[in-house]
């Protein structure tokens, strides 16, 4: 038995200079797992609660000492003596101990950090890599895939201080033979984009996730400069590289309208979907995330109707990694893909349940970081261990993003042909 003998919580810093929760789980025999909770900027209203202290005299109210105390107090007491390999049982103990719908008593940041640390400790106890342990927890032992990265190389919206409304413009190196080559392609495009922007006299400062954040006149301009960079880097857009958008549309949804302030345009629900469809006809955009507000379910039905057969429509704020909400989406034919963020739901077990439900319904699952990250690379192991096929973990700079890419390089080196890189086949509507 992988007996838990100690649980430790502490306050550490995330990539935006805000506190977050780190946890350690110690087992008999000296096995230790350590993990940290990430934090989002554009958040869905139905996400599990990230517990902050609210003490304005400390970290401007963003301290997490209350959540840390919950780790070191009630969570530790409840888990001492339990078996770390029984992940579902551990997570349920913490969920029951919290007793709320959105984990606002103990904090999703406290529960998640312990949940992931326990998984890492259990993997160490079993003498296997974390991705292999996750595959076993998922009921798919030995079934792996290297994910196609969605690389956020140009930022707008909540992730940058500029006049671009769409939050993320991403490249996907779908023509690569393996993940290592995909990473190289993305890096070359990233550096070429810097030269293109510099040549136009535009800013090459970066946003929260490492993408550039220049002041462009429109969202179409953002796509145009990326196209230029891809081609200058020696790649063919639409064959070697495809494009993906994260609109984060909830951030500019006001009074039932989509207000693109940067463009000086206001759309109704169907009008904005038509606008996005027109972009997919001009550029090889194969994936659109949060193309409408999380509450605009009628609009989502229309968007899915006009694009769902050819474009991957990813629900992030829409589904918040929650199986109850995803069930409603599946039953109503809303979207065709789900973004998976650990901290939206708050435990590894619930995260795996959302991935399994999506796959069973023919939806894709895209594993994702948050804008506030740490050096913790657990999502890399999650992507491979569930054979999710796609990952979003930022641009090709900032060590909090690159840590995940480097872990994927190590995993690919270990697994070789056991973890194929399937490129375009992983993306809904493109197989």
From Swiss-Prot:
NCBIfam families according to UniProt: eno
Predominant localisation class: cytoplasm
Active site: 209 (proton donor), 341 (proton acceptor)
SMART domains named in the record: Enolase_C (SM01192), Enolase_N (SM01193)
EC assignment: 4.2.1.11
InterPro entries: Enolase, Enolase-like_C_sf, Enolase-like_N, Enolase_C, Enolase_CS, Enolase_N
Gene: eno
GO BP: glycolytic process
Protein species of origin: Shewanella oneidensis (strain ATCC 700550 / JCM 31522 / CIP 106686 / LMG 19005 / NCIMB 14063 / MR-1)
Record bears the keyword Ion transport: no
The protein's name: Enolase
Segments forming a coiled coil: none
């Amino acid at each position: 038995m992988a007996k838990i003998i100690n649980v430790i919580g502490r306050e550490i810093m995330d990539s935006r200079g805000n506190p977050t929760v780190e946890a350690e789980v110690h087992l008999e025999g000296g096995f230790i797992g350590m993990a940290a909770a990430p934090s989002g900027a554009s958040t869905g209203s139905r996400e599990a609660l990230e517990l902050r202290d609210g003490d304005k005299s400390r970290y401007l109210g963003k301290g997490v000492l209350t959540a840390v105390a919950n780790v070191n107090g009630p969570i530790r007491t409840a888990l001492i003596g339990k078996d770390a390999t029984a992940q579902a049982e551990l997570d349920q103990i913490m969920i029951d101990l919290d007793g709320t719908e959105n984990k606002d008593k103990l904090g999703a940041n406290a529960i998640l950090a312990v949940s992931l640390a326990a998984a890492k400790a259990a993997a160490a106890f079993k003498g296997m890599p974390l991705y292999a342990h996750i595959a076993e927890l998922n009921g798919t032992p030995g079934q792996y895939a290297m994910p196609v990265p969605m690389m956020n190389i140009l930022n707008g919206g909540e992730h940058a201080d500029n006049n671009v409304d769409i939050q993320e413009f991403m490249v996907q190196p779908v023509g690569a033979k393996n993940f290592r080559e995909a990473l190289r392609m993305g890096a070359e495009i990233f550096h070429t984009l810097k030269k293109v922007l510099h040549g136009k006299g535009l800013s090459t400062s970066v946003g929260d996730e490492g993408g550039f954040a220049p002041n462009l006149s429109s969202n179409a301009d953002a796509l145009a400069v990326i196209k230029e960079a891809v081609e200058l880097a020696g790649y063919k857009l639409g064959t070697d590289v495809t494009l993906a958008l994260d609109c984060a549309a909830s951030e500019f949804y006001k009074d039932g309208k989509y207000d693109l302030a940067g463009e000086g345009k206001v759309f109704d629900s169907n009008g904005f979907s038509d606008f996005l469809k027109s972009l997919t006809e001009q550029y090889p955009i194969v994936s659109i995330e949060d193309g409408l507000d999380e509450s605009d379910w009628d609009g989502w039905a229309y968007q899915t109707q006009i694009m769902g057969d050819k474009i991957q429509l990813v629900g992030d704020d829409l589904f918040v990694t929650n199986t109850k909400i995803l069930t409603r989406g599946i039953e109503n034919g809303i979207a065709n893909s789900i973004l998976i963020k650990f901290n939206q739901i708050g435990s590894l077990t619930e995260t795996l349940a959302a991935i399994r439900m999506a796959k069973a319904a023919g939806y894709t699952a895209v594993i994702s970081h948050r804008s506030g990250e740490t050096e913790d690379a657990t999502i890399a192991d999650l992507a491979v261990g569930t054979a999710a096929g796609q990952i979003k973990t930022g641009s090709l700079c900032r060590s909090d993003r690159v840590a995940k890419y480097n872990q994927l390089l190590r995993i690919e080196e270990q697994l070789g042909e056991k973890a194929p890189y399937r490129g375009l086949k992983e993306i809904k509507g493109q197989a």
